[in-house]
Structure formats: structure tokens, C-alpha cells
Regions:
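Single conserved hydrophobic/aromatic residue that forms the stacking wall/gate
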Residues: 1-12
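Divalent metal-coordination and catalytic microenvironments
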Residues: 13, 27-30, 67, 83, ...
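Short amphipathic alpha-helices and their capping/turn segments at secondary-structure boundaries
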Residues: 13-20
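Active-site-proximal segments of metal-dependent phosphoesterases and phosphodiesterases across multiple
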Residues: 20-62, 76, 81, 92-95
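Alpha-helix capping/helix-boundary segments
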Residues: 33, 69-70
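Binuclear metal-dependent phosphoesterase catalytic core
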Residues: 72, 76-139
Length: 139
């Protein structure tokens, strides 16, 4: 089973995550919590303060977002969460590694997730259909 919550208020997120019994807990949002971006740092700091603490408390496996139009996989020291930024199929922006970056690419594309009880794979795929990188988690 996979729990996917989108755009929910903080109180509702806490309630949903506290009752989650799924094998994998994946949260999808629009804005990144950790990512390289030329956009305002305050945007990410707010997400780290308001959202990341909730995700960590409830043992979320992966946080997936978009907003900045490039591929990024980040593992922040002290967190077991995989933070993933998904590219856009038609527009991509430059990207540079930050602390915790496992992979980043400015290629336009999309991601595909495959999940079973023991393994989660998120494949980052470019516009030609080539797998650029795979985020793998095992239970």
C-alpha cells in the first residue's frame, strides 16, 4: 500500500500521517523542501520549518515535488527521507548540487514510480525515454 497526500493543511497532514499503516509513505507537494533553485530561500526555509518536521516525525519515505523544473534527488544529513524534485516535460532549468545531492539534471522529462512491499523505485526519465537515474529504497 502507498499513502499519497497532496496539498493538505498541516493539521490534516498530521492526522493522516499519524494514522498511516501503509508499507510506504509518500507525500507529494508542489514546492521543494530542499533543492537547488534561484528562487527565494525563504520559500524553502518555510517548507523546512512547517512541513519537513511533520514528515520526519511520521517516518515519511519520500517527498516528491516539482515547481523548479529539473531533476533532483537529495538526502539531507539527519533525515531518512528521499527528497525528489521532478522535472517538466517541456521546460527545464539549470541545476547545481547542494549539500545532500545524490543526483541532479537539467534535462526535461518525467518520473515513474514502481512499488511493492519490499522495494520502491522512482525512475527519472528524459524526454527521449532514457532512464537518467533511479531512486531506490528497500524495506
Amino acid at each position: 500500500d502507498c499513502l499519497l497526500s497532496r496539498g493538505l493543511g498541516d493539521v490534516y497532514k498530521r492526522q493522516v500521517l499519524a494514522s498511516a499503516k501503509e508499507d510506504w509513505i509518500i507525500v507529494a507537494g508542489h514546492h521543494p523542501i530542499y533543492a537547488y533553485t534561484p528562487k527565494e530561500e525563504s520559500e524553502r526555509l518555510d517548507m523546512q520549518k512547517r512541513v519537513d518536521s511533520i514528515l520526519r516525525k511520521h517516518n515519511v519515505d519520500m517527498y516528491i515535488c516539482g515547481h523548479i523544473h529539473n531533476f533532483q534527488h537529495i538526502r539531507v544529513p539527519g533525515s531518512d527521507i528521499d527528497y525528489v524534485v521532478n522535472s517538466a516535460a517541456s521546460l527545464a532549468r539549470k541545476v547545481e548540487p547542494i549539500e545532500g545531492t545524490k543526483f541532479c539534471s537539467p534535462e526535461p522529462g518525467f518520473s515513474v514510480c514502481s512499488i511493492d512491499k519490499k522495494e520502491l523505485n522512482l525512475r527519472m526519465i528524459d524526454k527521449k525515454g532514457n532512464v537518467l537515474y533511479t531512486v531506490t529504497r528497500k524495506k
